[in-house]
């Protein structure tokens, strides 16, 4: 899939990965076990400020954006009130990148407030390894996967979802 969109005055004719580094000010302490929910609430509530993005948010489909965790990592198990952290959001959708860039810098929830957004396009290069500090999240009506699925079934589901995402993204079938 190739796009030709303007983003900060740059015209590209290739698939771009847009990265937004959002500086966040914490309005209250957030225990590590609540962090992903707080971050998801921050991003989701920003999406829901726009009528057309509400249906995008509520649709059961691939969103083609990812959200990291706060940086710097806290050695303790609590992210501290009155501290500034960085949240990284990435997407391949230029319109979504522009929206996040404009909205997240002034957005706030009860737990955090966006201050600034730094934008960049990730340089193209061969990927030699993939690592993450954010786990894979698999939503299911049955709840947490370990209560109803073996490790082999979980790995098969992850692979199947990856193939579906690739097919959806490229328009090809593998």
Where are these predicted regions, by residue range?
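RNA-interacting cores
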Residues: 2-174
């Amino acid at each position: 899939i190739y796009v030709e969109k303007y983003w900060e005055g740059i015209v590209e004719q290739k698939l771009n990965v847009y990265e937004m580094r959002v500086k966040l000010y914490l309005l209250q302490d957030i225990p590590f076990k609540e962090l992903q929910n707080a971050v998801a609430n921050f991003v989701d509530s920003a999406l829901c400020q726009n009528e057309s993005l509400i249906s995008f948010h509520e649709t059961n489909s691939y969103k083609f954006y990812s959200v990291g965790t706060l940086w710097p990592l806290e050695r303790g198990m609590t992210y501290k009130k009155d501290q500034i952290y960085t949240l990284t959001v990435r997407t391949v959708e230029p319109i979504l990148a522009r929206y996040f860039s404009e909205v997240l810098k002034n957005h706030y929830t009860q737990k955090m407030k966006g201050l600034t957004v730094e934008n960049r396009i990730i340089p193209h290069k061969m990927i030699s390894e993939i690592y993450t500090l954010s786990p894979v999240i698999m939503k299911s009506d049955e709840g947490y996967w370990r209560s109803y699925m073996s490790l082999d079934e979980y790995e098969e589901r992850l692979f199947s979802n990856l193939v579906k995402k690739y097919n959806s993204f490229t328009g090809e079938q593998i």
